[in-house]
């Protein structure tokens, strides 16, 4: 989708040649049902990348990415993996680290581009590169959104029409949080967000305001740090 294509555009501005990879990684899915239902549109994806001008598309098979069997490596992400998504998806980020490290070792890029939509994943990949000392620079690319603010995602096609309309609450809430950040405390912001979701059809797994580097949740805004809000 256009969110993925924005990664290509960012890469093309700074590199002579751009390779896009497509691989559905089974070790980062905690729920086998989610893996089975994940949208698979390979031919359409390749067509879009070709139209955009990508120089090459790498579509490895399972054996190429997991020559020693379907196992994840264990990483020390210095606690990044224990926050937010990590609390609900144990082992997920080891799966991410394993597949991205293998991809980098095979392709050997100078630069790699990942969307900020999965900000925790972006932080994890930066930490993996730091730990493994791979010679690649990781770049984050701002989230691309639909006109109503919903982040572009392959999984959006699985939403019903009603769910799709209701999903805009996420971006609307984050936009409010950005304004509240200027005048309210962390605790006051949290209470307001919880109230918004209490009156919605969504069950809120987490709302976190965290240090953008460590992803550690904060209960106070320190002037020398930058923060991000996550739903």
What is the predicted role of each segment?
Residues 207:
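Substrate/ligand-engaging "lid" and interaction regions
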Residues 2-202, 210-220, 225-227:
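Nucleotidyltransferase catalytic core that binds NTPs
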């Amino acid at each position: 989708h256009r969110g993925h294509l924005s990664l290509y555009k960012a890469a093309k501005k700074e590199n002579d040649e751009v390779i896009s990879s497509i691989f559905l990684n089974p070790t980062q899915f905690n729920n086998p049902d989610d893996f089975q239902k994940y949208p698979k549109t390979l031919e359409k994806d390749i067509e879009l990348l070709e139209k955009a001008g990508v120089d090459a598309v790498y579509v490895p098979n399972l054996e190429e990415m997991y020559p020693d069997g379907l196992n994840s490596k264990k990483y020390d992400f210095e606690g990044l993996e224990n926050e937010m998504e990590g609390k609900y998806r144990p082992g997920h980020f080891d799966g991410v680290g394993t597949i991205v490290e293998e991809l980098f070792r095979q392709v050997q890029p100078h630069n790699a581009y990942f969307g900020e939509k999965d900000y925790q994943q972006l932080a994890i990949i930066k930490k993996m590169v730091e730990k493994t000392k791979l010679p690649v620079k990781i770049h984050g690319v701002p989230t691309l959104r639909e006109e109503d603010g919903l982040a572009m995602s392959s999984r959006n096609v699985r939403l019903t029409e009603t769910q799709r309309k209701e999903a805009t609450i996420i971006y609307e809430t984050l936009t409010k949080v950005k304004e509240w950040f200027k005048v309210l405390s962390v605790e006051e912001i949290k209470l307001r967000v919880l109230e918004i979701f209490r009156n919605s059809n969504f069950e809120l797994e987490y709302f976190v305001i965290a240090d953008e580097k460590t992803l550690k949740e904060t209960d106070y805004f320190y002037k020398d740090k930058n923060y991000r809000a996550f739903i």
